[in-house]
């Protein structure tokens, strides 16, 4: 509403006539019907965006001496006398007949009915303009980032203002970008780890671009080991076992050979832990390093493990490794040559 104050100039008789005429035309405080009752009225309603300039058109008839603008029952202008203290309002006069009201930087408080009254030779004639101020959507409240355990029920809230009232929609920002039904509240029942991530709330009313805000949902779950794999090992060489895991919070990894916990930096063992994997390296492999290795992953929600044997090379299945294999080959060659010599010797005896 435009703030008002009584002007210092103008004819009191003219103002009295205007108010009296309005009282007669608007019994019991009711407003005149939209559309006015004199020619030259451009429109009976005006829609503008908040912050824009509104021009409420009104024109004087031939023979009309004065005009007045009122906001509900309060006078804004009487003729050229300004009764409002609001610096945003003025009279727009593109020609001698125009008597339009201009409001700069309109706000929602300016919303409502305005009446233009024109003094003719006989009686005041009026026209009403209803000003509607549209407001861009604005999200004023959204759920904070949350951390929940897998299987919990989650409710996200997004509240927005605007005129017209904005519609609210949600979507999960993921490779599938799954949309949800519109509404201020988004309910997720029995949330899973795949439903973790950012959720986007969008408020839209076609006045301007949608207002968008995001909330992050973190889903805790117990660790899982997805892969346990080793590289080939040889005596005197290096061996590597890789343990791939997942969990939120990130799991803590430990290693065991048999029942014994392994410590990085001891007995040629090096362990490097990352958020989703652990690497165990064995330097200068000896027979003592062979055995069953277990990777353990744990966080506050649980623990899991997986085991893998670290065995000698495939030749070890015959009990032959390293220098022994060379000796065995030499011995086998000697036996073979000896057998051939014996055969030739027997053949000569028979022939002779």
From Swiss-Prot:
Residues 1-35 form the signal peptide. It is a lipid-anchor; GPI-anchor. It holds the Pfam family Ig_3. One of its GO terms (biological process) is cell adhesion. One of its GO terms (cellular component) is plasma membrane. Belongs to the immunoglobulin superfamily. IgLON family. This is Neuronal growth regulator 1. The lineage of its organism: Eukaryota, Metazoa, Chordata, Craniata, Vertebrata. The gene is NEGR1.
């Amino acid at each position: 509403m435009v703030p008002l104050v009584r002007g210092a100039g103008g004819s009191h008789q003219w103002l009295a006539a205007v108010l009296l005429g309005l009282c007669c035309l608007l019994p019991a405080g009711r407003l005149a019907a939209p559309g006015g009752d004199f020619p030259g009225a451009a429109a009976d309603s005006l829609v503008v965006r908040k912050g824009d300039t509104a021009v409420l058109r009104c024109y004087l008839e031939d023979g009309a001496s004065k005009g007045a603008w009122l906001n509900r029952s309060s006078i804004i202008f009487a003729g050229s006398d300004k009764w409002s203290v609001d610096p945003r309002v003025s009279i727009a006069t593109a020609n001698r007949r125009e008597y339009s009201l201009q409001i700069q930087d309109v706000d929602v408080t300016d919303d409502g009915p305005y009446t233009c009254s024109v003094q003719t030779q006989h009686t005041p004639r009026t026209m009403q303009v209803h000003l509607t101020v549209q407001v861009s959507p604005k999200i004023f409240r959204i759920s904070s980032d949350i951390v929940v355990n897998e299987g919990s029920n989650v409710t996200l809230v997004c509240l927005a203002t605007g005129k017209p009232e904005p519609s609210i929609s949600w979507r999960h920002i993921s490779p599938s970008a799954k949309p949800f039904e519109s509404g201020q509240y988004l309910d997720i029942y029995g949330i899973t780890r795949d439903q973790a991530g950012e959720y986007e709330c969008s408020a839209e009313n076609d006045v301007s671009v949608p207002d968008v805000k995001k909330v992050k949902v973190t889903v805790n779950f117990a660790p899982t080991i997805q892969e346990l794999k080793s590289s080939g090992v040889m005596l005197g060489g290096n061996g590597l076992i890789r343990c791939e895991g997942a969990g939120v919070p990130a799991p803590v990894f430990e290693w065991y050979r048999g029942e014994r916990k392994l410590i990085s930096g001891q007995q040629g063992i090096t362990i490097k832990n990352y958020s989703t994997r652990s690497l165990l390296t064995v330097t200068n492999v000896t027979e003592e390093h062979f055995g069953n290795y277990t990777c353990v992953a744990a966080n506050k929600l649980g623990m899991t493990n997986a085991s893998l044997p670290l065995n000698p090379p495939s030749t070890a299945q015959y009990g032959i490794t390293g220098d022994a294999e060379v000796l065995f080959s030499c011995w086998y060659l000697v036996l073979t040559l000896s057998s051939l010599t014996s055969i030739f010797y027997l053949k000569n005896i028979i022939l002779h």
